[in-house]
Amino acid sequence: MNLYENRLEELKEEFNYKSKDIAKYFKANKSTYSEWEHNKIPIPTRRLIQFANFYKVNIDYILKLTDKKVNINKGTELDLKLIVERIKETRNKLNLSLRALGEKINCSFSAIASYERGEKLINSDILISLCKISNTSIDWILGRI
């Protein structure tokens, strides 16, 4: 399975949108949007939230981590404090140190520490890996459910 696999193209077609219109709406470069849509590059975490809010679905569904499509009608803003708490809770549930978690998800322990301190938003690649090893929903970690 491609780490970047997603349903952006499928959702776009379901709603009868064109790629150029979606790119324009989100103020994204058309070629960048195309790379996201065709699984060439990871979708940044902030964009994942925007796409999920736009299509009113769960991020886990967009990223093909589940086939269960959950309608989420309320738009969700980033709550970095909640995300920080949930990342820590997930790591603690796994009973792993920062270094051990980093080794499992191919991320430096210092990057994980900065995510846990709220210094920066967790990278989508790392978020996907964390959710896969912990069997946790991305939507839960990001405070959408």
Q: Where are these predicted regions, by residue range?
A:
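DNA major-groove recognition helix of helix-turn-helix/homeodomain DNA-binding modules
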Residues: 46-61, 125-140
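A short, Lys/Arg-rich alpha-helix, primarily the initiator
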Residues: 1-16, 70-93
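Short alpha-helical DNA-recognition segment
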Residues: 16-35, 95-113
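The alpha-helix within a helix-turn-helix
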Residues: 12, 23, 52, 91, ...
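Short amphipathic recognition helices of helix-turn-helix/homeodomain-type DNA-binding modules
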Residues: 61-71, 140-145
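Residues within the helices of the helix-turn-helix
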Residues: 9, 20, 49, 88, ...
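Residue-level detection of the helix-turn-helix DNA-binding "recognition helix"
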Residues: 13, 27, 38-40, 67, ...
